[in-house]
């Protein structure tokens, strides 16, 4: 009898653990997050490298907590690479472009091209302020759970 209770207890703990992990996985998958993506060409000029460097520095300095907790991510992709052609097509990318978007893991809910990066690239303070303002707008929506489409 004690063995049966022990086995039953072990099975209950196992079932509970599986359910908890499954629930966590689903919640994590549906969690809203900000993705900042810099699309660049295969051959890169100094201006393109500068924009990426300034964007990366800004994000790492201002949003280190968000990067660590997964609320925000930054990536740099070659839009001319065949692997990224679907994304380049989705966002109508034909030159170097910075995108900020809200997604819930598998679905992009809202996105925007940050077109003033070229205008501000030679003024780091304006560049940084512009990117921070745009990302903060999206972060507000994520924190408030407003972007649910």
Region spans (language model):
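Bacterial N-terminal signal peptides that target proteins for export
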Residues: 1-11
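Bacterial N-terminal signal peptides
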Residues: 9-20
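Bacterial Sec-dependent signal peptides at the C-terminal "C-region" and cleavage site
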Residues: 18-30
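Local sequence-structure signature of Cys/Sec-based thiol-disulfide redox active-site neighborhoods
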Residues: 30-63
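Solvent-exposed, acidic/flexible segments
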Residues: 41-48, 52, 81, 120-128
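Thiol-based oxidoreductase modules, predominantly thioredoxin-like and allied folds used
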Residues: 67-83
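Charged, often glycine-rich, active-site loop that binds/positions anionic groups
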Residues: 85-94
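Non-catalytic, surface beta->alpha helical segment in thiol-disulfide oxidoreductase systems
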Residues: 100-144
């Amino acid at each position: 009898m004690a063995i049966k209770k022990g086995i039953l207890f072990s099975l209950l703990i196992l079932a509970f653990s599986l359910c908890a992990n499954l629930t966590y996985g689903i919640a994590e998958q549906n969690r809203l997050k900000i993705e900042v993506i810099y699309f660049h060409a295969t051959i890169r000029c100094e201006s393109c490298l500068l924009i990426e460097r300034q964007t990366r520095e800004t994000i790492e300095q201002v949003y280190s907590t968000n990067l660590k907790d997964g609320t925000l991510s930054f990536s740099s992709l070659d839009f001319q690479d065949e692997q990224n052609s679907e994304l380049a097509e989705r966002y109508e990318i034909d030159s170097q472009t910075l995108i900020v978007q809200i997604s819930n893991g598998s679905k992009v809910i809202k996105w925007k091209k940050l077109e003033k990066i070229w205008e501000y690239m030679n003024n780091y303070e304006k560049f940084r302020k512009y990117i921070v303002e745009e990302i903060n707008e999206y972060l507000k929506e994520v924190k408030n759970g407003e972007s649910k489409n």
